[in-house]
Design a protein with these regions (language model features):
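Polyanion-binding surface elements
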Residues: 1-14
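Short secondary-structure junctions
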Residues: 14-20
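C-terminal structural segments of small proteins and small subunits
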Residues: 33, 40-66
Length: 66
């Protein structure tokens, strides 16, 4: 999965961009901030980290929260 696709899923699931530190973005939802989410544009993200973040924050393939 491309890094930009993961970030689109976070936004679609209701997370709001809070701030960036270098190449890592932080999102916030219901007053809770996410851990740093790596952002490298169109580059492929490792499946392990992508799957970990999807499971941890409950985001399915369409960006909806489950």
């Amino acid at each position: 999965m491309k890094s930009s696709e993961l970030h689109r899923r976070f936004i679609k699931a209701g997370y709001k961009f809070d701030h960036a530190e270098g190449s890592h973005y932080f999102y916030i939802k219901d007053g809770v901030m996410t851990e740093p989410i790596p952002y490298h544009g169109a580059k492929e993200m490792g499946t392990g980290i992508a799957n970990k973040l999807i499971r941890k924050y409950g985001i399915d393939g369409e960006g909806e929260q489950f």
